[in-house]
Amino acid sequence: MAFHGKDDVLDIKAQAHVWKIIYGFADSLVLRCAVELGIVDIIDNNNQPMALADLASKLPVSDVNCDNLYRILRYLVKMEILRVEKSDDGQKKYALEPIATLLSRNAKRSMVPMILGMTQKDFMTPWHSMKDGLSDNGTAFEKAMGMTIWEYLEGHPDQSQLFNEGMAGETRLLTSSLISGSRDMFQGIDSLVDVGGGNGTTVKAISDAFPHIKCTLFDLPHVIANSYDLPNIERIGGDMFKSVPSAQAIILKLILHDWNDEDSIKILKQCRNAVPKDGGKVIIVDVALDEESDHELSSTRLILDIDMLVNTGGKERTKEVWEKIVKSAGFSGCKIRHIAAIQSVIEVFP
């Protein structure tokens, strides 16, 4: 191919950029393939880098074509999940990059359930209906699946468990940053309810870090039924739109971004009724968007916003929107603090 000037070079770069966007799903599904094959765990359990043939012999599939596997591994190297090292005899061997610790099934902060859950076919299908979700009468998920995401999860126990395990993995990463970056926020609190707390990962971490706090896990009855049986933590099933157990503090971690502003205000009003006017607070852990920021996490936050648009009808919010819905729910105001996470802490006061 002959280039005839700057415009041709720019055109090729533009084409390459669009091709990369078109095949953006390749990253997700190559990652899923690697998880299904257990590539990270196989290399990790080997305790040293592995040659192509050795790795092929350990895979849970028969008749592995080593050239096909090589191409998958080459892509994982490009994704910075694996790296290539050469042995003394010049043989290529594959080792794990630091990010791979999140891709091990047995890792404390494993993202494997989230990867498997978000890339399974039923959760990919609604993305094809994104344009149908632009109206006010249902999300893309509802248009594609004929039900809300919550109805789907309630009717598909295996997917619900995978979803909650995925959220638990996310929670371990987030809660560590929450506690280390906001210890002062929990001082003086004697009781706390984790609303929509899933299997109890967050409330257990808070209880372990602050044993003086009487902690309660609150979620839908079918979620509570599958939650951990945790010592010193009361478990209550219910509906946060109808009532919330009383406590000095309520925590809503990755909850309100699932709901539109109107529903979020309804939830916040129930939380306001559950905390004392003097000394009470609601702790929201969610993204606080800065639309003008070029921070390295900004693009991830915008991806999460589109995820909410497609699947839940919720949204990630700017500081201004957080202040608006908090006051609409009857609170006096809020304070936003940033922690070492994609999300921020929005501390809300009666």
UniProtKB/Swiss-Prot annotation:
Keywords: Methyltransferase, S-adenosyl-L-methionine, Transferase. One of its GO terms (molecular function) is protein dimerization activity. Transmembrane segments: none annotated. The keyword Disulfide bond does not apply. Gene3D superfamilies: Vaccinia Virus protein VP39, Winged helix-like DNA-binding domain superfamily/Winged helix DNA-binding domain. Pathway: Alkaloid biosynthesis; (S)-reticuline biosynthesis; (S)-reticuline from (S)-norcoclaurine: step 4/4. PROSITE patterns: SAM_OMT_II. It holds the Pfam family Methyltransf_2. Its EC number is 2.1.1.116. The active site is at 257 (proton acceptor). It catalyses: (S)-3'-hydroxy-N-methylcoclaurine + S-adenosyl-L-methionine = (S)-reticuline + S-adenosyl-L-homocysteine + H(+). S-adenosyl-L-methionine binds at residues 196, 219, 239-240, 253. GO terms for biological process: methylation. It comes from the Eukaryota. Coiled coil: none annotated. InterPro entries: COMT-like, O_MeTrfase_dom, Plant_O-MeTrfase_dimerisation, SAM-dependent_MTases_sf, WH-like_DNA-bd_sf, WH_DNA-bd_sf. Belongs to the class I-like SAM-binding methyltransferase superfamily. Cation-independent O-methyltransferase family. COMT subfamily. Catalyzes the transfer of the methyl group to the 4'-hydroxyl group of 3'-hydroxy-N-methylcoclaurine to form reticuline. Homodimer. This is 3'-hydroxy-N-methyl-(S)-coclaurine 4'-O-methyltransferase. It comes from Coptis japonica.
